[in-house]
Amino acid sequence: MSLKPFTYPFPETRFLHAGPNVYKFKIRYGKSIRGEEIENKEVITQELEVPVEKKAVGAVMRKRKHMDEPSSPSRPGLDRAKIGTSSQGPSKKKPPVETRRNRERKTQQGLQETLASDITDVQKQDSEWGHSLPGRIVPPLQHNSPPPKERAATGFFGFLSSLFPFRYFFRKSSHS
């Protein structure tokens, strides 16, 4: 499909996010750009493939910024295209941000360690004082580790699956 000239009825500013760069486009009404005629200018005849706009696209783009692998194996060309290069030196990666889930996990591990040490301290004290009860010693409670995840999907569908586990809807029922 060839590109055809078009105009907008109202002036508009658009932003294109390409990697670390942000390009600003001012689209104005009329056939000229800043008073210059278009016919004598070099025109870019490339088409840009833009994914469908959704609310989650912004989050996916932020996530892709930190990933090195392509987001979707079925459409690998989408995120590999580089529009421009940055004039800055190599970017320094930030250390991973501590998420709420990681904080909760660390807190839970700390509580488990504290609970285990408290139980062993009480058992030692009881045995020293001769208060131990007949019967075997029960080890502290251990939380079961979560079941191994099924083959983890990467890219956009992996992102959606992390938000909402679709596998529960598409499970094969044993009542067939």
UniProtKB/Swiss-Prot annotation:
Residue stretches of biased makeup (Polar residues): 108-120
Subunit record text: Component of the MAJIN-TERB1-TERB2 complex, composed of MAJIN, TERB1 and TERB2.
Basic and acidic residues: compositionally biased ranges: 95-107
Cellular location(s): Nucleus inner membrane; Chromosome, Telomere
Keywords: Chromosome, DNA-binding, Meiosis, Membrane, Nucleus, Telomere, Transmembrane, Transmembrane helix
Coiled coil: none
Positions on the Nuclear side per record topology: 1-151
Keyword DNA-binding belongs to the record: yes
Entry's family note: Belongs to the MAJIN family.
Phylogenetic lineage: Eukaryota, Metazoa, Chordata, Craniata, Vertebrata
Gene Ontology terms: biological process: double-strand break repair involved in meiotic recombination; homologous chromosome pairing at meiosis; meiotic attachment of telomere to nuclear envelope; meiotic telomere clustering; oogenesis; spermatogenesis
Function summary: Meiosis-specific telomere-associated protein involved in meiotic telomere attachment to the nucleus inner membrane, a crucial step for homologous pairing and synapsis. Component of the MAJIN-TERB1-TERB2 complex, which promotes telomere cap exchange by mediating attachment of telomeric DNA to the inner nuclear membrane and replacement of the protective cap of telomeric chromosomes: in early meiosis, the MAJIN-TERB1-TERB2 complex associates with telomeric DNA and the shelterin/telosome complex.
InterPro entries: MAJIN (IPR027816)
Name assigned to this protein: Membrane-anchored junction protein
Molecular function terms, GO-annotated: DNA binding
Segments traversing the membrane: 152-170
Membrane-topology annotation of the record: Single-pass membrane protein
